[in-house]
């Protein structure tokens, strides 16, 4: 009897021991899983604000409602601004050739903020549908949406407001008339412009829009490497099929290409190959020609020149010159600098050039040619910095001559230093200058077209998958 009681007591003791030691591990596992769940919930909560901003860029079908609501609120303020502005201009009595300064009211600022969010976070399909202004109806009755070259520049330039009564899926309707279209060809693009090669009137289709943004957002070196990879016989030329492969690979690496999804409902599908006008331009009428990297890079250079020319003309130059503040605005357009600092930099520029002589297009183009070599410029400026030399205006002009083979005028250097000489000692803040100029060179097209929420969730999911077994297995 005593033996049976002892055995039962030992058995119960063993069961209790197993329950105690076995139950402590699940408790620890549950604590770890609860900690992971808490961190995940915190990350989702922190991302809610980002999603809210994203929703503003995606949800409104057009800006008509926004314009009407904001117009009522800002009507009185706008009228006051206009009245005050008219009084000031009447008192100052400016020169007849001078343009009146156009002040943006509360309503315009809110609309431009909304349009900037569209440029930054929307899909290529929505960007194209919002900033395109023409819908051409063909003789069979089929309709296709087109951009003008000015629309294209506006779609990639921050703070450029879309014309009134034109917005998402709101267009000027034109019926196709071959004779009239041919007569109006020079209305949208000059004969020497690269846009003239795009077909009727120099208009830009959705496929052309994706192709042009790809060309603008891809460095020259990337195209050189891609051409060499598909040049199997080493003659430096590619045929049409090989070029389509080059284009597809390059496009898949850009932010526009990664965000694009074909949308048959809107008609914005990425057609295989290029438009007929571009294929003829690159490969001849029979499409059996060869395209060299030299000819393609010349096409890229002309495109950059024409886009820069359109940007210059948008500032309404007087006697072929734009003001120093307008040039500074071109440099800072894609900087991403906070509004307060941006305002301070513009005020500093206005202080230095109250009665400036302005800048010609040749001076502006020389500086942007200098920017095309910004990586080499960064290296050269770093060498000067390590050698203890000051980065003054003479140094910048020397770097431009050595690296980019262009001459920067003294006046251009004065404007650049007025913007980036923070402490006023006559020396350039090269780190900030180089970082902002790299963004300006790519026109903001290299930035991801999202708020980063998707990438955050993908990283969290990958981390959870890799660490799940570590939480589940007991510690040794």
From Swiss-Prot:
InterPro entries: EF-hand-dom_pair, EF_Hand_1_Ca_BS, EF_hand_dom, MICU1/2/3. Residues 99-110 are annotated as: Polybasic region. The modification Phosphoserine is found at residue 122. It is found in: Mitochondrion intermembrane space; Mitochondrion inner membrane. Residues 68-106 are annotated as: Disordered. Keywords: Allergen, Calcium, Calcium transport, Disease variant, Disulfide bond, Ion transport, Membrane, Metal-binding, Methylation, Mitochondrion, Mitochondrion inner membrane, Phosphoprotein, Repeat, Transit peptide, Transport. Phosphorylation at Ser-122 by AKT1 impairs its maturation and stability. Pfam families: EF-hand_5, EF-hand_8. Changing residue 463 to R: Increased degradation by YME1L1. SMART domains: EFh (SM00054). Expressed in epithelial cell lines. Strongly expressed in epidermal keratinocytes and dermal endothelial cells. Changing residue 154 to Q: Impaired interaction with MCU. Changing residue 117 to A: Slightly decreased ability to inhibit MCU channel activity in absence of calcium. Changing residue 231 to A: Abolishes mitochondrial Ca(2+) uptake. GO terms for molecular function: calcium channel inhibitor activity; calcium channel regulator activity; calcium ion binding; calcium ion sensor activity; identical protein binding; protein heterodimerization activity. Belongs to the MICU1 family. MICU1 subfamily. Calcium sensor of the mitochondrial calcium uniporter (MCU) channel, which senses calcium level via its EF-hand domains. MICU1 and MICU2 (or MICU3) form a disulfide-linked heterodimer that stimulates and inhibits MCU activity, depending on the concentration of calcium. At low calcium levels, MICU1 occludes the pore of the MCU channel, preventing mitochondrial calcium uptake. It is linked to Myopathy with extrapyramidal signs: An autosomal recessive disorder characterized by early-onset proximal muscle weakness with a static course and moderately to grossly elevated serum creatine kinase levels accompanied by learning difficulties. Most patients develop subtle extrapyramidal motor signs that progress to a debilitating disorder of involuntary movement with variable features, including chorea, tremor, dystonic posturing and orofacial dyskinesia. Additional variable features include ataxia, microcephaly, ophthalmoplegia, ptosis, optic atrophy and axonal peripheral neuropathy. Heterodimer; disulfide-linked; heterodimerizes with MICU2 or MICU3. Homodimer; disulfide-linked. Component of the uniplex complex, composed of MCU, EMRE/SMDT1, MICU1 and MICU2 (or MICU3) in a 4:4:1:1 stoichiometry. The composition of calcium sensors within the uniplex complex can differ depending on tissues: a MICU1 homodimer can be present instead of the MICU1-MICU2 heterodimer in skeletal-muscle and kidney. MICU1 is recruited to the uniplex complex by EMRE/SMDT1, and it associates with MCU at low calcium levels, occluding the pore of the MCU channel. Associates with the MICOS complex. This is Calcium uptake protein 1, mitochondrial.
